[in-house]
Amino acid sequence: MKITVLGAGVVGTAAAYYLAADGHEVTVIERHAAPARGTSQSNAGLVSPGDATAWASPAALKTFLRGLYNHDLGIKVRLRFDPYFLAWSLRFLRQCTVARLRANSQVKLRLALYSRDCINAISADTGIHYDERKKGILYFFRSQHSLNTGTDNYRYLAEHGLPIEIVGRDRLVELEPGLAGVKEKIAGGVYSPIDQTGDSRLFVDNLAAYASEKLGVKFLFGTTVEGLDIQGDRVRAVMTSAGPVTGDAVVISMGPESGLLGRRYGIDLPVYPVKGYTATIPLEDESKGPTIGGADEDQLMAYSRLGNRLRLASTAEFTGFDRTHKPSDFTTMFRTARDLFPGAFDEKKAELWAGLRPMMPGSVPVIGQARYKNLYLDTGHGHVGWTMACGSGKFLADLVAGRKPEIDPQGLVYGG
């Protein structure tokens, strides 16, 4: 078939790779001048099944309300008139029960574990590299209370297949010597040995080049999707700034813009943008920086080591489609990073960035055929798009081919 994929981020590019590997003629439409220049450009760098716990939980409402007035928190809510945000919030709150938290987290973990294996298989099959480190990730807590509360979620994930190690201070510093200076400030943590880190933009750049050169995938960069030409129960063409693109099937993988396009054609797709901030800094003294990825769970800041660079990531800000940033947005992030890794970097040399996560109310992405016979979704991966993208792409390719997916599809296949 001729398949058109909308979006060349990590999700869309992974889908294009697997579809082309199945023998389809694939065209990818991307508004930016290169792949992975939107949501996938500068994420936390974590491939983290250990971060599969859904955002919606019984504690989420309290955190949400605190985010209205305390902008030093990792969660920020900017009040504005936005009917879509109100509707999304109500659906989010309906997911904030213990039962939904567990169900959503279990689905996310299933896909995340599968996707991690898919990433490694792609790397082995294609020979591409992306500053990857396969040394695990540390999730640590500064107080005994947060440690006791936080480890409950990890224990639940462990019950469903995630290998973890609950670690005290001594073991934590053994795993990450870079944290020796703050050992007494940390109560303990969780080590997920199968988690890993890597530069998603570099991965996508290399995968797109491979897909183009070896599999014949055609990328239309600098091309904006303007709409869909619907005839009856099928999409006849994708209308773009460069003219119509016809084909036998269409895949929507447009990140936070997916919901905007879907709603125009009667598709219930509650994807809402949640802004995040990252800083990428060259390490001045590599011996003082981290050797593996980590997350300060009390400060809500994640970090990864990407070659000789340090990637910092923080904040979940509900502010619509605003992608702007200013130096003060990074103040808390830099303060936390200086505390953890003093002398490792010079923040004046940081490359600052802000992007939008495509969040579903339950934190679970949607994959599969939607409303029209030849229209498919692969979107809504939220804060773990890098983690889930390759598994989603392979899962989607199986659905398109009519094959039985390699993982249980319950909770993943679109039903709207």
Curated annotation (Swiss-Prot):
FAD binds at residues 3-17. One of its GO terms (biological process) is D-alanine catabolic process. It catalyses: a D-alpha-amino acid + A + H2O = a 2-oxocarboxylate + AH2 + NH4(+). It comes from the Bacteria. InterPro entries: DadA (IPR023080), FAD-dep_OxRdtase (IPR006076), FAD/NAD-bd_sf (IPR036188). One of its GO terms (molecular function) is D-amino-acid dehydrogenase activity. Its EC number is 1.4.99.-. It is an enzyme of class 1 (oxidoreductase). Its cofactor is FAD. The keyword Kinase does not apply. Keywords: FAD, Flavoprotein, Oxidoreductase. One of its GO terms (cellular component) is plasma membrane. Belongs to the DadA oxidoreductase family. Oxidative deamination of D-amino acids. This is D-amino acid dehydrogenase 2. It comes from Mesorhizobium japonicum (strain LMG 29417 / CECT 9101 / MAFF 303099) (Mesorhizobium loti (strain MAFF 303099)). The lineage of its organism: Bacteria, Pseudomonadati, Pseudomonadota, Alphaproteobacteria, Hyphomicrobiales.
